[in-house]
Amino acid sequence: GGKEGLYNEVIDYTIAGTQKLIGGAEDTLRAGLDAAAGDRDALARATAAFVRAVLTALLGLGPEHWPRRLIMREIDTPTAAFDRLYQAIFQPLIDAFKQVVVIATDRDPDNPETTILTNALLGECLIFHRNRPIILRDLGWHEYTPDRIALVVDIVVEGILDALDLPAVKGEGARAK
């Protein structure tokens, strides 16, 4: 019980909510990668759908979303709870995206360069969530709206596909209209 027990319950709640928010994207990605079976167009579509789902979910969380602030605090100043957050949220996200990097680039999954590239590309998604106040101010936006989220997502998807030398995915997103 006590303060530590309450914090652990809050961490459990945060993990469950985050898994619900982005966990489906990881499962869909894995299924898409299996179905792609070497087809780079299908790999690009699966990758784009994953990035689109994760980034749309993260940017849709307003600044008032307290679990977001809790996760950021744990990243900045890890406590014992960070290990639980890492294992339940970050490791599955990284593992799912690393599969994309390995398949798209034919890199060794155990090579540190593969892990660095994976985290760099995931960082392209997470930076818009993590640095929300900076980016909003830089763009002159008060907040992310659905149209603005769609624009950010389109640009990030395009950049990640390009970095992985995957073909562009046509006919999706805000700029396809």
Regions found by a protein language model. Name each.
Residues E9, G17-E64, T114-L121:
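Hydrophobic alpha-helical connector segments
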Residues E64, F90-T115, D138, D162-G173:
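Hydrophobic alpha-helical bundle segments that form small-molecule/ligand-binding pockets
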Residues G2-Y7, A81:
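Short amphipathic alpha-helical segment with a characteristic S/N-K-E followed by hydrophobic residues
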Residues G62-R84, R132-D138:
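Amphipathic alpha-helical segments used for helix-helix packing
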Residues R45, T79-T105, A150-D154, E158:
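Amphipathic alpha-helical packing segments from all-alpha helical-bundle domains
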Residues V54, R68-I75, L121, C125, ...:
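Short alpha-helical scaffolding segments that buttress acidic/His motifs in well-ordered protein cores
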